[in-house]
Amino acid sequence: MGAPNRFIPLVVAALLAAGAAQAQGRQDPNLAYPHEVLTVKRDGYTIAGLVTRLPGRNELKYGVALFPGHPGILKLRQEDGELKFDLRGNFLVRTRRHWLDRETLVMVVDAPSDHWPTFYQEFRETPRYGADVAALVAEASRKFGVTDWTFIGTSEGSLSAFHAARMNPELARRVILTSSVFVAGKNGPGLSRVNFDALRSELLWVHHADDPCRFTAYRDAQAFAKRSGKPLVTVRGGGPARGGACEAFTAHGFVGVEIATLRAMHSWIRTGQVPADIAP
């Protein structure tokens, strides 16, 4: 009679784990999809990515590597058996589930662990950062069978995406830069000094016409698109906005027009075609 009682703690633990997963899914709908932290050990530090995919059998081909905005530090970690990370409200982080289909995997790229205190813009230009991202993407390719990668950055994360792609043309077929930081500021040079001739990947600019952030002005997006000779997708409408001008829930983060913006980017990845303007 007493033997079955040995299984009660296991059943309770399983129920608690399932309840925790459901609670996480309610707080962050992206966590309702299969996800895991992929970590690569480097020389005394690690670099990790948060991988999300559809459940069931997938024939994965496309990988979308997302580089979030300032400070670009997710701090992917486990606390009390639960996945924890920062920047959940970031445009790319909060919308990542909308990329998913049977052929597509999404990975949000964290800063290298030894740069969690300060992830400077200048560091993202260095060969070491390029090698770190390459190691993570190569491991994701090996584990999941992805053969076609697009690097996507938003705001300050555009620097990460651009330089990681510039240094790894064999991995990044395409780069999409959204709400990009164009001008120099206290955090670094932005994209003000980049050499577009050094980028071999296909490039797409995506920007909201009413972006209120002074470091990411729409007029600069127009100028950089012309300078690079690459297409610019203009996003209009959306809202309502909340928070500061350079924060994620304003036009800077495509609030209210996220899905239409992602659909245009997805179309470009698959077909090379995008509309000139996007509105909800």
Each predicted region: which residue ranges?
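Alpha/beta-hydrolase active-site loop
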Residues: 91, 118-144
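The feature captures the conserved acid-bearing segment of alpha/beta-hydrolase catalytic domains
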Residues: 174-237
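Short, surface-exposed "cap/lid" segments of acyl-processing enzymes
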Residues: 56-98
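Primarily recognizes the serine-hydrolase "nucleophile elbow" in alpha/beta-hydrolase
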Residues: 138-198
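Conserved alpha/beta-hydrolase
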Residues: 91-116
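Bacterial N-terminal signal peptides
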Residues: 9-18
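C-terminal catalytic histidine-bearing segment of alpha/beta-hydrolase fold enzymes
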Residues: 229-280
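N-terminal cap/lid segment of alpha/beta-hydrolase-fold proteins
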Residues: 24-59
